[in-house]
């Protein structure tokens, strides 16, 4: 009797894990975006390009810091609210949400993170 209960509990745990699991689209901390939607690597590349820009009359009016601030505002993107479709933008769900898809990787929607996703 105890073995049947243990097997049923394991099966229930496995099924709930499969249903609530979200496939990892990108691994590592480098895939995380800052508040402007720009990765750290892209930000470094933008700063490097600004430093290497040739000086002309249009650029002389702005320092590198002002140009970076202006470029940040143009690259902002809005996030996708909960229950919104995220098929083509899996990393753009709003804060405390994640893009969750069905078993075949379609019908993706931004939904509340599961308990284990919040913990890391």
From Swiss-Prot:
Residues 22-63 form a propeptide. Expressed by the venom gland. Not found in the whole body. It is found in: Secreted. Disulfide bonds join 79-94, 86-99, 93-110, 101-108. Its main location: secreted. It comes from the Eukaryota. Keywords: Disulfide bond, Ion channel impairing toxin, Knottin, Neurotoxin, Potassium channel impairing toxin, Secreted, Signal, Toxin, Voltage-gated potassium channel impairing toxin, Voltage-gated sodium channel impairing toxin. Residues 1-21 form the signal peptide. The presence of a 'disulfide through disulfide knot' structurally defines this protein as a knottin. Belongs to the xibalbin-1 family. Negative results: Does not show activity on potassium channels Shaker, Kv1.4/KCNA4, Kv2.1/KCNB1, Kv3.1/KCNC1, Kv4.2/KCND2, Kv10.1/KCNH1/EAG1, Kv11.1/KCNH2/ERG1, and calcium channels Cav3.1/CACNA1G, Cav3.2/CACNA1H and Cav3.3/CACNA1I. Probable neurotoxin. Strongly inhibits voltage-gated potassium channels (Kv1.1/KCNA1, Kv1.2/KCNA2, Kv1.3/KCNA3, and Kv1.6/KCNA6, with the highest toxicity against Kv1.6 (74% inhibition at 1 uM)) and mildly inhibits sodium channels (Nav1.2/SCN2A, Nav1.4/SCN4A, Nav1.5/SCN5A, Nav1.6/SCN8A, and BgNav). Induces activation of protein kinase A type II (PKA-II) and MAP kinase Erk1/2 in primary nociceptive and non-nociceptive sensory neurons. Does not show cytotoxic activity. Does not have an impact on Ca2+, cAMP, and NO signaling in the cell types analyzed. This is Xibalbin-1. It comes from Xibalbanus tulumensis. The lineage of its organism: Eukaryota, Metazoa, Ecdysozoa, Arthropoda, Crustacea.
């Amino acid at each position: 009797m105890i073995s049947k209960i243990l097997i049923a509990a394991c099966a229930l745990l496995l099924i709930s894990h499969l249903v609530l699991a979200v496939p990892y689209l990108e691994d590592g901390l480098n895939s995380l975006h800052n508040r402007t939607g720009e990765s750290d690597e892209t930000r470094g590349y933008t700063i490097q390009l600004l430093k290497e820009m040739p000086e002309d009359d249009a650029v002389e009016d702005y320092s590198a810091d002002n140009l970076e601030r202006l470029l940040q505002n143009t690259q902002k993107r809005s996030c996708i609210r909960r229950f919104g479709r995220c098929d083509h933008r899996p990393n753009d769900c709003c804060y405390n949400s994640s893009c969750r898809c069905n078993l075949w990787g379609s019908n993706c929607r931004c939904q509340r993170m599961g308990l284990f996703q919040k913990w890391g």
